[in-house]
Amino acid sequence: MEFKHISVLLEETIDSLNIKEDGVYVDCTLGGGGHSKEILKKLSHKGKLIGIDQDTSAIKAAKERLKDYENVIYVHNNFYNIDSILEELDIDKVDGIIMDLGVSSYQLDEASRGFSYMKDAPLDMRMNREENFSAYNVVNSYEEEELFRIFKNYGEEKFSRKIARFIVEKRTENPIETTGELVEIIRKAIPAKFQREGHPAKRTFQAIRIEVNKELQILNKAIEDSVNRLNKDGRLSIITFHSLEDRIVKVKFKELEKPCTCPPSFPICVCGKEPQIKIITKKPIEPSKEEKEINSRSRSAKLRVCRKI
């Protein structure tokens, strides 16, 4: 299956990076190479792009899309490791970093990946298929209380308790092996009148995907490490697709902009924590009405940008 992914907030993201033609840039979520190609168009032969992705299918697709460019380094890894990746490449500082945290259209559309609640497939949801831990393990081995926790915290699911109970009851008969089986369990757990608000499995699938790929833990550390690797005036641009991610980015940016932990009553700062960034986007940038109409998957996207000081 061809790797297809429509880059969200493409123009806004590229503009936010304030690209220098001889700069060094990192695309932490290479995907099909949409954002990367626009960055490369603005670079001279002295500039450089590092493209990171944990999905080998994405890297293969990006290499094909970017085959006309020689100043690209491809890295099969998780952007959680951005610090060690740059260390291994002997790159100290960079001028801009982008993270697009959405699941690609390819991953959603390829049924065998198990990300979609619209297609029956094995329970998988691994971004990196070289990892062993998958959605199957979460659904079939987590205790009821643990399932409740992730559905509530990562999916903000109103019926987390009931869904967790129904899953545990069902798997005592036989292991739950497919997305279709899981969707049916969720449908039975959620009252019919609440199933009119979008697909009933959406929040639960989001929660399981986040748990399988440790997405929220990765994001916090990656933001800190990325800021540390930016040159002065370098930009970090992050696109999120749900409120949990957006909240993490918003809070972390605020912590890095105003890190002082001194009590308000102190006349001067004595903690010694200096601001590291300036937030560029006081409110997140959202897709235009036109983009939302063209690409429905862009509707929940938000872009936040900061500048290293």
From Swiss-Prot:
Signal peptide start and end residues: none
Keyword terms: Cytoplasm, Methyltransferase, rRNA processing, S-adenosyl-L-methionine, Transferase
Molecular-function annotations in GO: rRNA (cytosine-N4-)-methyltransferase activity
Top-level division of the source organism's lineage: Bacteria
Amino-acid positions noted as binding S-adenosyl-L-methionine in the UniProt annotation, renumbered to this chain: 33-35, 53, 79, 100, 107
HAMAP family attached to this UniProt entry: 16SrRNA_methyltr_H
Matches recorded under Pfam families: Methyltransf_5
Catalytic reactions on record: cytidine(1402) in 16S rRNA + S-adenosyl-L-methionine = N(4)-methylcytidine(1402) in 16S rRNA + S-adenosyl-L-homocysteine + H(+)
Name by which UniProt lists this protein: Ribosomal RNA small subunit methyltransferase H
Similarity-based family: Belongs to the methyltransferase superfamily. RsmH family.
InterPro entries: RsmH, SAM-dep_MeTrfase_MraW_recog, SAM-dependent_MTases_sf
EC number: 2.1.1.199
Compartment list: Cytoplasm
Gene Ontology cellular component terms for the protein in this record: cytoplasm
GO annotation, biological process: rRNA base methylation
Function: Specifically methylates the N4 position of cytidine in position 1402 (C1402) of 16S rRNA.
NCBIfam families: 16S rRNA (cytosine(1402)-N(4))-methyltransferase RsmH
